[in-house]
């Protein structure tokens, strides 16, 4: 089983890295990009000892407690069972 976790800054939180990437894109000719927000992506291989519901609960807690800063970041968890 594979868990995918996407961590992004909450709306309203300033994103200087995203702004820098947006500025660089415009500078080198990538026009038409309105905004860039940066984030983090994690792939977590699970050992199969948990069913899908347990795995989601386990990874959600891990994402909240370890992978993100809940004050300024949101996260999304996807579980792939193949």
PLM regions with names:
Residues 6-10, 47-49, 80:
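Solvent-exposed residues in well-ordered beta-strands and their adjoining turns
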């Amino acid at each position: 089983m594979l868990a995918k976790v996407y961590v992004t800054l909450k709306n309203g939180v300033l994103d200087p890295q995203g702004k820098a990437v947006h500025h660089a894109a415009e500078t080198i000719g990538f026009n038409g990009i309105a905004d860039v927000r940066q984030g983090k992506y994690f792939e977590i291989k699970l050992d199969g000892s948990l069913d899908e519901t347990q795995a989601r609960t386990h990874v959600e807690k891990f994402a909240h407690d370890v992978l993100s800063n809940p004050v300024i970041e949101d996260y999304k968890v996807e579980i792939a069972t193949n």
